[in-house]
């Protein structure tokens, strides 16, 4: 089990990312557009830098939804590799069977 403070911090980051997503997308579109005037691009870059650091989606960490483990996450299921194996053995994941050949 991860520290609760780390899990809570990650949840706060998700909220901040969602709050600023539209603004970040608009600024990045202005910066990337080839027809944007240089001074307009500079203004957009400055505005993007003034947004909170946690507004960037790369700062959100994928965590196991059961215990918050930060590594070895299978994003399709939202759990870590260890939890996935346990749940698969107990038959809690529909359609998942252990391979044998």
From Swiss-Prot:
Keywords: Ribonucleoprotein, Ribosomal protein, RNA-binding, rRNA-binding. One of its GO terms (biological process) is translation. It comes from the Bacteria. InterPro entries: Ribosomal_uS14, Ribosomal_uS14_bac/plastid. Transmembrane segments: none annotated. Belongs to the universal ribosomal protein uS14 family. Binds 16S rRNA, required for the assembly of 30S particles and may also be responsible for determining the conformation of the 16S rRNA at the A site. This is Small ribosomal subunit protein uS14. It comes from Tropheryma whipplei (strain Twist) (Whipple's bacillus).
């Amino acid at each position: 089990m991860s520290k609760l403070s780390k899990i809570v911090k990650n949840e706060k980051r998700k909220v901040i990312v969602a709050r600023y997503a539209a603004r970040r997308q608009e600024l990045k579109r202005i910066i990337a557009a080839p027809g944007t005037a240089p001074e307009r691009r500079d203004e957009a870059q400055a505005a993007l830098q003034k947004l909170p650091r946690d507004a960037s989606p790369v700062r959100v960490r994928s965590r196991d939804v059961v215990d918050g483990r930060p590594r070895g996450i299978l994003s399709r299921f939202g759990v870590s590799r260890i939890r996935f194996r346990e749940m698969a053995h107990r038959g809690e994941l529909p359609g998942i069977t252990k391979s044998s050949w």
